[in-house]
UniProtKB/Swiss-Prot annotation:
<feature type="binding site">
    <location>
        <position position="69"/>
    </location>
    <ligand>
        <name>Mg(2+)</name>
    </ligand>
</feature>
<dbReference type="InterPro" id="IPR003008">
    <property type="entry name" value="Tubulin_FtsZ_GTPase"/>
</dbReference>
<comment type="subunit">
    <text>Dimer of alpha and beta chains. A typical microtubule is a hollow water-filled tube with an outer diameter of 25 nm and an inner diameter of 15 nM. Alpha-beta heterodimers associate head-to-tail to form protofilaments running lengthwise along the microtubule wall with the beta-tubulin subunit facing the microtubule plus end conferring a structural polarity. Microtubules usually have 13 protofilaments but different protofilament numbers can be found in some organisms and specialized cells.</text>
</comment>
<feature type="binding site">
    <location>
        <position position="204"/>
    </location>
    <ligand>
        <name>GTP</name>
    </ligand>
</feature>
<comment type="similarity">
    <text>Belongs to the tubulin family.</text>
</comment>
<dbReference type="InterPro" id="IPR017975">
    <property type="entry name" value="Tubulin_CS"/>
</dbReference>
<dbReference type="GO" id="GO:0005525">
    <property type="term" value="F:GTP binding"/>
</dbReference>
<keyword id="KW-0479">Metal-binding</keyword>
<dbReference type="InterPro" id="IPR023123">
    <property type="entry name" value="Tubulin_C"/>
</dbReference>
<dbReference type="InterPro" id="IPR013838">
    <property type="entry name" value="Beta-tubulin_BS"/>
</dbReference>
<dbReference type="GO" id="GO:0005874">
    <property type="term" value="C:microtubule"/>
</dbReference>
<dbReference type="GO" id="GO:0046872">
    <property type="term" value="F:metal ion binding"/>
</dbReference>
<feature type="binding site">
    <location>
        <position position="69"/>
    </location>
    <ligand>
        <name>GTP</name>
    </ligand>
</feature>
<keyword id="KW-0460">Magnesium</keyword>
<dbReference type="GO" id="GO:0007017">
    <property type="term" value="P:microtubule-based process"/>
</dbReference>
<comment type="function">
    <text>Tubulin is the major constituent of microtubules, a cylinder consisting of laterally associated linear protofilaments composed of alpha- and beta-tubulin heterodimers. Microtubules grow by the addition of GTP-tubulin dimers to the microtubule end, where a stabilizing cap forms. Below the cap, tubulin dimers are in GDP-bound state, owing to GTPase activity of alpha-tubulin.</text>
</comment>
<dbReference type="InterPro" id="IPR037103">
    <property type="entry name" value="Tubulin/FtsZ-like_C"/>
</dbReference>
Length: 441
């Protein structure tokens, strides 16, 4: 089987991760003790991708939980699904990273890294044919960003040919809980550009917008936000976990979505999004899903795809849907919105259909877009970074842990390069002149 080892780092990563396991356990018919209670063969057919079967017919997630302070771990352990995880797979320190990337990457995190890697090795050795790793973390804090990127580079060193995919919660323009987010985020992106294969960018502000605007929630909690993220994670991984007509795996996804190695930062979306009670009052068609999926209001990163162009995109449908219908919709959306797709990659939407819909729905779709408008996100962080770095504000916290100003400058210029690469491909046109000159002779 094509197994995936899941690693969740820091407070944000552990909360998103816990929700993800709750959602997919539900889909696979695994209860809070890891016992299978489902009644469909397809639930169990590819369950090995994410679960390990142990004695007594129990299923244990291939998950490694890492944090530099015990708080979040304790609440995961005390939650409904806390008994699901293998107790040895909780790796935690006592000191915390205090929102400091340098602590997570160089000092506190480095002390814990070996014990985390040991468990990751153990999990990987139990796989028949390891497909890759997925990391859930945030880029604004200290542990998820600093130690998360350290783990990614260590895993990369040991497993260079396996896929590395991350669900990264990026700092949002209006919702900020840490003053030093721009530093932590820039230093992390510097790492992710080099060491990750696929980065799904999620940001809290876009999630809040969806909660207010679409789900009509008055006071959304982090629980509601995590629910949205887990819906996307479940949708993206659906065709890895269930038999379907058009399957996809992490590598196929990367091959279809990454036209140039550094440009692997994706926007994600999910459809149908409706307020909790209104689901049963509407019938969805593939057309509705497609419209909603490509709508900027459904994007979980605060970037508007209309300001850029899609290099590539992927649509993962779930439910009893004919592949023909999906193909027709994809062609139609490309024709209708042709100015939002680059013309030098024809047929740039990959689609996949998985027969099993999420619980309580007839059909759903997850969307992944590689759009040049993601540069807005990097630009925003870059501007905030510059404003503080010019005055060397808060820098002593980082240099005190042994960091060098050079590292900041490097990370900043790497991010600026990334922005200009996206811009360059956004402006690139089909080169017709090359052919026209030949007529002269």
């Amino acid at each position: 089987m094509r197994e995936i080892v899941h690693v969740q780092v820091g407070q944000c990563g552990n909360q998103i991760g816990a929700k993800f396991w709750e959602v997919i356990s539900h889909e696979h018919g695994v209860d809070t003790n890891g016992t299978y209670f489902g009644n469909k063969d397809n639930q169990i057919e590819k369950i090995d991708v994410y679960y390990n079967e142990v004695s007594g017919n129990r299923f244990v997630p291939r998950a490694v939980l890492v944090d530099l302070e015990p708080g979040t771990m304790d609440s995961v352990r005390a939650s409904n699904y806390g008994r699901l995880f293998r107790p040895d797979n909780f790796v935690f320190g006592q000191s915390g990273a205090g929102n400091n990337w340098a602590k997570g990457h160089y000092t506190e995190g480095a002390e814990l890294i070996e014990s985390a890697m040991d468990i990751i090795r153990k999990e990987s050795e139990q796989c028949e044919c390891l497909q890759g790793f997925q990391i859930a973390h945030s880029l604004g804090g200290g542990t998820g960003s600093g130690m998360g990127t350290l783990l990614i580079s260590k895993i990369r060193e040991e497993y260079p040919d396996r896929m590395m995919c991350t669900y990264s919660v990026v700092p949002s323009p209006k919702v900020s809980d840490t003053v030093v987010e721009p530093y932590n985020c820039t230093l992390s992106i510097h790492q992710l550009v080099e060491n990750a294969d696929e980065v799904f960018c999620i940001d809290n502000e876009a999630l809040y917008d969806i909660c207010f605007r679409t789900l009509k929630l008055v006071t959304p909690s982090y629980g509601d936000l995590n629910h949205l993220v887990s819906a996307v994670m479940s949708g993206i991984t659906c065709s890895l976990r269930f038999p379907g007509q058009l399957n996809a795996d992490l590598r196929k996804l990367a091959v279809n979505l990454v036209p140039f190695p550094r440009l692997h930062f994706f926007m994600v979306g999910f459809a149908p999004l409706g307020s909790r009670g209104s689901q049963q009052y509407r019938s969805m068609t593939v057309n509705d899903l497609t419209q909603q999926m490509f709508d900027s209001k459904n994007m979980m990163a605060a970037c508007d795809p209309k300001n850029g162009r899609y290099l590539t995109a992927a649509a993962y449908f779930r439910g009893k849907i004919s592949t023909k219908e999906v193909d027709d919709q994809m062609i139609e959306i490309q024709n209708k919105q042709s100015e939002h797709f680059v013309e030098w990659i024809p047929h740039n939407i990959k689609s996949s259909v998985c027969d099993i819909p999420p619980k309580g729905m007839k059909m759903s779709a997850a969307f992944i877009g590689n759009s040049t408008s993601i540069q807005e996100l990097f630009k925003r962080v870059g501007e905030q970074f510059q404003a503080m770095f010019r005055r060397k504000a808060f820098l002593h916290w980082y240099t005190g842990e042994g960091m060098d100003e050079m590292e900041f400058t490097e990370a900043e210029s790497n991010m600026q390069d990334l922005v200009s690469e996206y811009q360059q491909y956004q402006d690139a046109k089909m080169d017709n002149d090359a052919f026209e000159d030949q007529d002269l002779y």
